[in-house]
Regions:
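Short, small-residue-biased leader/transition segments that mark boundaries at the very start
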Residues: 2-4
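FAD-binding glycine-rich core of flavoenzymes that anchor FAD
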Residues: 9-35
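Glycine/charged-rich beta-loop-alpha catalytic/anionic-binding loops adjacent to active sites
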Residues: 27-31, 74-83, 214-221, 261-268
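Glycine/serine-rich anion-binding loops at beta->alpha junctions
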Residues: 29-50, 223-231
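Mobile "lid/hinge" segments at catalytic clefts and subdomain interfaces of large enzymes
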Residues: 46-153, 159
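Accessory "access/gating" subregions that flank catalytic or transport cores
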Residues: 124-246
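C-terminal catalytic subdomain
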Residues: 228-271
Length: 271
């Protein structure tokens, strides 16, 4: 919300943005239902709950309590605003909620991707697989940044592994796909994450209001309220993260079914 108002194309008074900023600083957070957005015509329904809070209507979260907006404003020594022309529309006609959901998804995805290489390195070690397939020289032949980084991460993690080092001279030709193809899958997911992150960041710093008010007092309508870039970025991110889960499941299956005497079913030596 603040990024959009700061650009100056919404045709709203500075006091509206000021009140919103004061509410954020004092910890007054409008209660927005989990469901209700349409995205294709702006996040009308969820954003309306932010607008309601500014005029003293609806409910908010303040000081660890859910309460009426008017009560929270009074306790924080703030006054609700009386909306003027264009301000009501400006508050609800944008992609802010979709984008906020995207930011949260990116944060969680980043944590998952960062831990995925570490977890998979442990799987490589536990399965008595080789470290050699993660050598940077191999992966530099593929022009995918994510793959190169993932392979380098795993190769570095396993550097001091006595278990992996003891496997260097064994007679096994190749390890299962779920081990030696980790950088290819993790890397592809990292690249997709990076692209989604770029799109979401672009949306954060864009103007998604409609109509737009320009400095020469020209009023122009467009479709900036449409959240298609955000939607496609998050669809792609969902696919990327699901692939991390898929290869993880294959590694679990590998351990459960067993491979030989050194890697028995369920990892249980006796039973």
């Amino acid at each position: 919300e603040m990024c959009i108002r700061d650009r100056g194309y919404s045709g709203v008074r500075p006091k509206l943005a000021t009140l919103l900023l004061k509410m954020i600083n004092k910890g007054i957070l409008p209660i927005i239902p989990r469901q209700g957005s349409v995205g294709a015509s702006g996040d009308l329904a969820p954003l309306s709950h932010i607008g309601c809070a500014l005029i003293g209507e609806g409910t908010v979260y303040f000081q660890d309590r859910i309460m009426p907006s008017m009560k929270a404003l009074k306790e924080a020594n703030l006054k609700p605003i009386e909306l003027e022309a264009k301000e009501g529309l400006s508050l609800i006609n944008g992609t802010q909620v979709s984008t906020a959901i995207g930011v949260k998804a990116l944060y969680k995805a980043c944590k998952l991707l960062r831990t995925a290489d570490i977890i998979s390195a442990l799987s490589v070690e536990a399965s008595l697989s080789t470290r050699a397939v993660f050598k940077p020289a191999i992966h530099r032949l593929k022009k995918h940044k994510g793959q190169t980084v993932s392979a380098k991460n795993i190769y570095s993690i396993l550097k001091q592994s006595m278990i992996v080092q003891s496997h260097e001279n064994c007679d096994k030709i190749q390890d299962p796909y779920c081990m030696r193809c980790i950088p290819h899958i993790h890397g592809a997911s990292w690249d997709m994450f990076a692209n989604s992150e770029k799109i979401i960041n672009n949306e954060i710093n864009s103007v998604s209001d409609n109509p737009l008010i320009f400095r020469n007092e020209e009023v122009l309508s467009s479709g900036h309220f449409h959240a298609e870039p955000v939607a496609q970025a998050l669809d792609a991110l969902s696919i990327a993260i699901s692939e991390i889960g898929a290869i993880s499941e294959r590694r679990i299956h590998h351990f459960m079914k067993g491979a030989d005497d050194r890697l028995p079913c369920f990892g249980a030596i006796d039973g």
